[in-house]
């Protein structure tokens, strides 16, 4: 790694530690997050045209996790509109991972399925329209997981 990049990551690590321990930073973050959730801020975003109910900063963290872990299977419980599934699968594609993405949603509505159909096919995404606590879903996923080396669950 180039020394300038090494310095960048060292400074980044120090900043994160400082911010983590900074009481004012924590308080402001808490207040902003509380207000943002109250005002529906997380409903303002899409990924490839699909609503994604996440803070944009969380997406960067998920991207970093996917880059480091390099999962060949990602499972998400609680899919809502499907945007995060598309996000995870597109990140796997960016990192050239021959991977699968599976979502489990108790109520994956038809309009969401129709909206996501092309992207789910493009990215090889599967949605299980059942409860994540259903024993049949658990059994299915346990069998599925056996075929993969690195599994990431959100």
Question: How would you name each of these model-derived features?
Answer:
Residues 1-43:
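Membrane-proximal basic amphipathic "stem/tether" segments
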Residues 45-47:
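Short glycine/proline- and acidic residue-enriched helix-loop micro-motifs
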Residues 50, 57-154:
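S-adenosylmethionine/decaboxylated-SAM
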